[in-house]
Regions:
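Thiamine diphosphate
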Residues: 1-177, 181, 185-187, 194, ...
Length: 346
């Protein structure tokens, strides 16, 4: 059983969680580009075709509009589709299938009709050796204002497994359209601070464990000198930066992994900011219309606009090729530099 295995990385635990979901929900189907025989570009769906057969795990055409359109049709027939969009940038070809069709059906039919689905999307930045905009898209803005949509993003394996269970239950029970955003650069990550430390490997959670919708993960909850809000690749980045900040400035640093990006849990954000001396928002998305804007808005609307605050985020541009990508994305050094600015000003 996976819960009896040693701690594992993100990709393996997503694979194990998908296996569990296909066992739990007999009506579930997993499909997308290269998900079957190949097991996905990053082997995340490896072995699922052999375990469940071609009627439940199958490849599709290279057409995201068709993939999401087929998911709606299958959902209307009583199935639980788990479609994969191979890369986040590819979603934009088919965004209206979510915005104008899938997410609006319950609303416009007064809940007479539902088309539940759990959409897996591999994305975000920092992927090395294979990239450019179409494989390292860091923007989820197109998903942020779709009514009824739920978007989760896990940065570590155990959270991923529990989040998938929650999203699948939301789809199956409430008929929700859910998106599970998978940070490609963290798929195989095992270490946090130094090579070989194994600090980004985690035990697989027992089958009865799931996440509470909207609840983030808090590291060093008692610390309040600086509170960092982040998600995805920003979580290990902020944890590494926190160690440097603590050594250099003598601050105790709390890191808050939002986990749930749509809708943002404003109450949770306000709760974490209430005792903060300073706030730093680390958002790998773009400067305009990114998740960070929502975090800051939640703090201001909770009456916390007086707090000293800095934001580290991606530039308003496309992700370039090779090492140039690092010039437009947040980094460990950018996070520590923002903390130094807060120290100078406050």
């Amino acid at each position: 059983l996976p819960e009896r295995q040693p701690p594992r990385h993100l990709a393996i635990q997503i694979n194990q969680a998908l296996h569990d979901l296909l066992c739990k929900y007999p009506s579930s189907l997993l499909f997308g580009e290269d998900v079957a025989q190949k097991g996905g570009v990053y082997t995340v769906s490896k072995g699922l075709l052999k375990a469940f057969g071609p009627r439940r795990v199958f490849n599709t055409l290279l057409d995201e509009t068709m993939i999401l359109g087929m998911a709606q049709g299958l959902a209307n027939l009583g199935m639980l589709p788990i479609p994969e969009i191979q890369y986040l940038a590819y979603l934009h070809n088919a965004a209206d299938q979510l915005r104008g069709e899938a997410c609006s059906l319950q609303f416009f039919s007064n809940d007479q009709y539902r088309n539940p689905m759990l959409v897996r999307i591999a994305g975000l930045g920092y992927q090395k050796g294979f990239g450019g905009h179409f494989h390292n898209d860091n923007s989820i803005t197109a998903l942020r204002d779709i009514p009824g949509l739920v978007v989760g993003c896990a940065s570590r394996g155990d959270d991923a497994a529990m989040m998938l269970r929650t999203l699948a239950a939301l789809a199956q029970v409430d008929g929700r359209v859910a998106v599970f955003l998978e940070p490609i650069a963290l798929y195989m990550t095992k270490d946090l601070h130094a090579a070989g430390d194994g600090q980004w490997l985690f035990p697989y959670p027992a089958p009865d464990q799931a996440l509470v919708l909207g609840e983030g993960r808090v590291y060093a909850a008692e610390a309040s000198d600086l509170v960092i809000f982040t998600y995805g690749n920003g979580v290990p980045m902020s944890l590494r930066a926190a160690r440097t900040i603590e050594a250099e400035l003598g601050w105790q640093v709390r890191v808050v992994d939002l986990r749930w990006l749509v809708p943002l849990n404003a109450g949770f954000i306000a709760e974490q900011g209430a005792d903060a001396q300073r706030v730093l928002v680390v958002d790998e998305g773009r400067h305009s219309a990114g998740v960070g804007e929502g975090v800051i808005t939640a703090l201001v609307e909770a009456g916390l606009g007086h707090l000293p605050l800095q934001r580290v985020c991606g530039a308003d541009t496309y992700t370039p090729l090779a090492g140039a990508a690092m010039c437009v994305l947040p980094s460990d050094n950018a996070v520590t530099s923002a903390a130094r600015v807060l120290a100078q000003d406050h």
